[in-house]
C-alpha cells in the first residue's frame, strides 16, 4: 500500500487503528519521513505530545527539509505558551 492510499484509509479510522496502520507502514518503510510526520500528527491530535515530538524528530533526522520541522516548531511554541508556569515557577 502506498502512503497516499494509507492516508485515505486512516482518515476515518480511530486513533488506535490509524496509529497501528501507520506503525506497520513505517516498519516496512523506515525511511519514510512523511509517514512519521503523519503518525506524529495523529499522536498530537490525541494529546500524546511526547510521542508526536519523537515522530517529528525521527522524520527530521531522515529528511531535514521534512514538513515535520514546521510541525515541531509549532508544537514547541504551543508547549512553551501553555506551560510557562512549569518553566518559570
Give, region by region, the residue ranges found by the protein language model.
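Alpha-helical linker/edge segments of TPR/alpha-solenoid repeat scaffolds
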Residues: 11, 49-51, 76-89
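Short coil turns that delineate tetratricopeptide repeat
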Residues: 30, 63-64
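Helix-start (N-cap) detector for alpha-helical repeat units in TPR-like alpha-solenoids
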Residues: 33-34, 66-67
Amino acid at each position: 500500500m502506498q502512503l497516499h492510499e494509507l492516508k485515505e484509509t486512516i482518515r476515518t479510522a480511530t486513533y488506535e487503528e490509524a496509529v497501528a496502520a501507520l506503525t506497520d507502514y513505517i516498519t516496512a518503510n523506515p525511511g519514510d519521513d512523511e509517514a512519521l510526520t503523519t503518525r506524529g500528527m495523529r499522536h498530537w491530535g490525541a494529546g500524546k505530545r511526547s510521542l508526536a515530538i519523537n515522530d517529528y524528530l525521527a522524520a527530521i533526522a531522515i529528511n531535514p527539509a521534512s514538513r515535520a520541522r514546521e510541525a515541531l516548531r509549532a508544537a514547541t511554541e504551543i508547549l512553551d505558551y501553555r506551560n510557562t508556569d512549569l518553566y518559570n515557577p
